[in-house]
Structure formats: structure tokens, C-alpha cells
Amino acid sequence: WFRRKIGRLTGLWLVRPSHLRQNCRMSSSINKIAKAVTRTLSFLVLTASMATIARGDATASLAQALKAADAGDWTTALQAAQGAGPSGGDVILWQWLRDGQGKLGDYEAFLARHPDWPGLPLLKQKGEVAVARSTDPARVLAYFGADKPGTGKGSVAMVQALMAQGRSQEAEAEAYRGWTTLKFDAADESAMLALQGEVLKLAHEVRLDRILWDGGRRAEAERMLPRVSKDWQALALARMALRSDSASAVKLTSAVPKSMLGDPGLAYERYTYRMRADRYDDAAKLILQVSDSKPALGDPAAWAGRRADLVRILFRQGKAKDAYRVAAGHQLTEAEGADYADLEFLAGFVALRELNDPALAVKHFKHLKTAVGTPISLARADYWMGRALEAAGDKAGATAAFVRAAQYQTAYYGLLAAE
């Protein structure tokens, strides 16, 4: 078959040597060439076939490994991954480590081999359980490098390692950072307090406040109660009761000492409590009382979602002035991204449509534009800026804004601007 193919390619019809004429001096050479080419092509075809089979086997192994990994069957997944090739095997290993299954050496080896893979922050954080089992301070600190622990267990391990090396100030700083920002189970809390109990006495209220803002950490909050003052205990109980819509919420809120009534976290829980009860006028009154400054809000980003909800409700109810004040008083920065952009848009929209104040609207639409980067959002910002400038009588400015918006023809507002 190969001889016939080569014959067609070269313009020769190769036949068996025994049938060649005896006086054809080239027959022997041609036959040798044909045999050599036949052997070469046979080898190439065989190699390609084997590679195809190997790829097929690797793909099948990887599919089996991924299916087992999804089911949490890591024994089967790792065994199947052995036939998935180097890259396929590492994909399964990556998943295994991100599930917190490996030993410290497994994490160290993978991070050294793949320092630029996606999802490494989570992988490294999951490895903190393994780090905590190490008794080598240098190895523990080398694992974290310039990064800070992301778990309570990891923070305890770093504090222990720093103390073992005599780096007491760094140990105290990490203990405070971890205690006030991270989640701890009961065992890790006890371990951290055993290491840095005196230093952390001043941080208990900060930690409890953060736990209450986060929500969903009731067990941690309850463990913190004996470590804080009676006033803070009353405040924490009221905040937890309000968040859970407890029947005792009103009673516990009334029991909060006068000195604690201005707590931003308490104001936030009272606000969301009223929103869930559809008490929108009461909610508006409360949020406007605390929107004059960032400290009064405590955590402006936590308020943002419910704030935007209230703006839309007040707008539909025809309460434009209150809607604008709620939107504009967010106290967010551009760093908050989508929440900042949403509230700036709402403030601008209400100012333009209901307050008939196009200059005020332009200010908010400019703020909106500085906080966005996608074609849809940029087109929306420039379109509404154009509408506001148009209402203000600035035809040239409006045209320029519409032209900018019209650049984005895949966006709804880009198409509107083009009209």
C-alpha cells in the first residue's frame, strides 16, 4: 500500500522487484528507496497512532479523576490522575490541595512548582491546617512568606513561630491582627489566648464587634461575651436579637445602656430590622440620622445594599427628597466599586428626574463614571450625563457626552446615545 502511495507521489508505479525488467538498472535503487520510505512512514503512522491512543487514555483518566474529585472521592481521583499526564495530574492535585487534604510538604512542593497558578490564595489558606502541625518555626514562617495567615489556626501557628524566634513585637502584632479579623474555633481561641492573652485583653471588644458585623458567627459571639464588659454584653445581645428577628429584640434593645445607644452596629441592626418589617419611613429616619459621617455608619459598605433598596422604595412612593438624601449619604469611596456606582447613579437619577437639578445630577454621573470600566456602565454614565447637561442647557457638553456613550454600540445606552 505504501509503495503504491509513494509511486503516485513520485510519478512512478512501484511494483514487486521480481516483475521489473532485467535491463532496468534503476530498479534496485528505486526498490530500496521504496522500502526505506515504507519503513519510515510505517514508523510515523505507528507513533502517531500510539500518541493518539495515549492522549485518549489520558483524557479518559482525567475525566474519571475529575468525576471522583467532584464526589469527594480523593482516593479514586488521585489514582486515576496517575494516568492523566503531568498537567492533568497537577489539576487534580490542585483540587485536592484546595480541599485541604494534603500534608505540608505537598503544599510546599506544589507552590514551588506552580507559583503562578490561579486560585493559590485559597490553596495556601487551606494549607494552614498542615502548617499548624509543623514544629519547625522557620518552615512555618517560610510558608507564609510576605503573606498573612487567613485562618485562626494559621495565625496561631505564625504567632508560635515568631515567639520561638524571639520576635515578640511581631508576634503581638499578628496576634492582634488575627484576633480582630479572623474566624477562630474554640480550640484555636484557647491556643491564641494562652500565647497572647494579656495583649489581647484590649482587643476583645474589637473582635466581638467584627463578629457581629459579619453575622452568621453566633457561636463565636457567645464565646466572646464573658470576655467583655457588661455594657458590651448588653449591646451584643441586642444586636444578635435584632438580626435574628427574635421576639426579645425590643426588650433587649431597651436594655442597652445609654452610653452604647450610639453604636453604629446597633443602628445598622435596627435599620435592617425595620426594613424587613416594611417600616420604610422609620428606616429612612434612622439611616438619615447616621449618614452624615463614616464613623457614624461604622461600616458604610454593610449598609449599601439595603440603602439602595430604600432609595428605590422611596422613589416609587414619591418621596424624592428623602430618596436623594439616602442615596447621596452613602459615605462610600470608589474602592467599593459596584455599590458606590449604584448609589451615585441613583442619586443622579433622582436629582435629574424628580428634583429638577441637572447640575447636581451631573456631579453624581461624573462620580459614577470614575468608578466603572465596562462598556455597559461607561455608556450609561455618559448617556445620563448627556441628558443632565441637555437639561442644563449645555448643548455642546450634552453632544460630547452622547458621542462618548455612542462609542459602545454593544451597550443599550450606547445605542440610545447614537439616536
Report the location of each language-model feature.
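Generic short N-terminal amphipathic or hydrophobic helices
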Residues: 5, 29-32, 52
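Short, low-complexity, intrinsically disordered N-terminal modules
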Residues: 17-18, 30
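Alpha-helical solenoid repeat scaffolds
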Residues: 22, 53-419
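Bacterial N-terminal signal peptides that target proteins for export
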Residues: 28-41
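Bacterial N-terminal signal peptides
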Residues: 40-49
